[in-house]
Amino acid sequence: MQRELVSFPLSPTVRVKLVAAGFQTAEDVLGVKPSELSKEVGISKEEALETLQIVRRESLTDKPRCAGASVAGKKYTALELLEQEHTQGFIITFCSALDNILGGGIPLMKTTEVCGVPGVGKTQLCMQLAVDVQIPECFGGVAGEAVFIDTEGSFMVDRVVTLANACIQHLHLIAGTHKDEEHQKALEGFTLENILSHIYYFRCHDYTELLAQVYLLPDFLSNHSKVQLVIIDGIALPFRHDLDDLSLRTRLLNGLAQQMISLANNHRLAVILTNQMTTKIDKNQALLVPALGESWGHAATIRLIFHWEQKQRFATLYKSPSQKESTIPFQITPQGFRDAAVTASSSQTEGSSNLRKRSREPEEGC
């Protein structure tokens, strides 16, 4: 199994530059001369030589030192995997229809991609989940914390405050109905201040900053073990506007996807990636498809596509290893992400939407 460069005891600066240049594993650099590595990565020849020496030495001993590095060769039986699936947690969305088609909510230990045009509700879902992941276990939550990586500047703390207050009020109503001591005690710590204190926000302005933050996450998570959700809101923007080299972009995206899968598995957390839609011309027809190409479509375990039909928002479960394709309506209210009002035209449909053939919808909302 190839060992990733992020697991070597290199300086953070060199580590980030290696990743940004497209070097992912030890095998990628071991055949490169110091002068070539220096030129391609943008480091001094001395740093390049030291890097190669460290990689060679560590490759011989093959003892990963990085927190969160996976242990090669660990095996599971099919029964253990089945039990793991049954015991994994879910982060509820407060839209029961969406939770149902996902099998219970956003699953832990998996990567979920949410695609859609601007204004359809991707960031709203991310902010909702950053609050919902903190719901106490006695209320059906996972009692975790959230990391929010923002590449587009769409995060609105005032909106998070509104969502958090609505969630607190909802749980108080439930506790009032049950009148259970456990519920009352759990709510003592579920305050607005605590909710905001456990959303860790990072603003990344380009792909270098994004890659740096992603590859430093294992160290951060080792010091914040309660994190159960990592969000990258706007995966496409840094790579669509800052990179002209398509082969380099593909390598960087593949490395980022593998890192997020590793984080989800090793730290038993959920990963949310939001992606924009782009126009594809097919047989003289303009179609909306997820950005970053077809190869990126295999990166996430689950793919949701949000879209408009007239003035109604819909979510289509387009890809899932365990659930069938389904489409449901939803709405975004002042209180947050919620079920749509039930009408004859907005009842749940299953397997009815092929998003690859969907023509451009109006980009409404904000």
UniProtKB/Swiss-Prot annotation:
Segments traversing the membrane: none
Region (Required for Holliday junction resolution activity): 1-117
Location of this chain's protein in the cell: Nucleus; Cytoplasm; Cytoplasm, Perinuclear region; Mitochondrion
Record field: compositional bias (Polar residues): 343-354
Main location: nucleus
GO cellular component: cell junction; cytoplasm; cytosol; mitochondrion; nucleoplasm; nucleus; perinuclear region of cytoplasm; Rad51B-Rad51C-Rad51D-XRCC2 complex
Span list, region Interaction with RAD51B, RAD51D and XRCC3: 70-127
GO terms, molecular function: ATP binding; ATP-dependent DNA damage sensor activity; crossover junction DNA endonuclease activity; four-way junction DNA binding
Region (Disordered): 338-366
SUPFAM superfamilies to which the protein is assigned, alphabetical: P-loop containing nucleoside triphosphate hydrolases (SSF52540)
Keywords per UniProt: ATP-binding, Cytoplasm, DNA damage, DNA recombination, DNA repair, DNA-binding, Mitochondrion, Nucleotide-binding, Nucleus, Phosphoprotein
Residues involved in ATP binding: G116, V117, P118, G119, V120, G121, K122, T123
Assembly behavior: Part of the RAD51 paralog protein complexes BCDX2 and CX3; the complexes have a ring-like structure arranged into a flat disc around a central channel. The BCDX2 complex consits of RAD51B, RAD51C, RAD51D and XRCC2; the CX3 complex consists of RAD51C and XRCC3. The BCDX2 subcomplex RAD51B:RAD51C interacts with RAD51. Interacts with SWSAP1; involved in homologous recombination repair. Interacts directly with PALB2 which may serve as a scaffold for a HR complex containing PALB2, BRCA2, RAD51C, RAD51 and XRCC3. Interacts with HELQ.
Family as reported in the entry's similarity comment: Belongs to the RecA family. RAD51 subfamily.
PANTHER family cross-referenced by the UniProt entry: DNA REPAIR PROTEIN RAD51 HOMOLOG 3 (PTHR46239:SF1), DNA REPAIR PROTEIN RAD51 HOMOLOG 3 RAD51C (PTHR46239)
Role, per record: Essential for the homologous recombination (HR) pathway of DNA repair. Involved in the homologous recombination repair (HRR) pathway of double-stranded DNA breaks arising during DNA replication or induced by DNA-damaging agents. Part of the RAD51 paralog protein complexes BCDX2 and CX3 which act at different stages of the BRCA1-BRCA2-dependent HR pathway.
Protein name: DNA repair protein RAD51 homolog 3
Species this chain originates from: Cricetulus griseus
Species lineage: Eukaryota, Metazoa, Chordata, Craniata, Vertebrata
Gene responsible for this protein: RAD51C
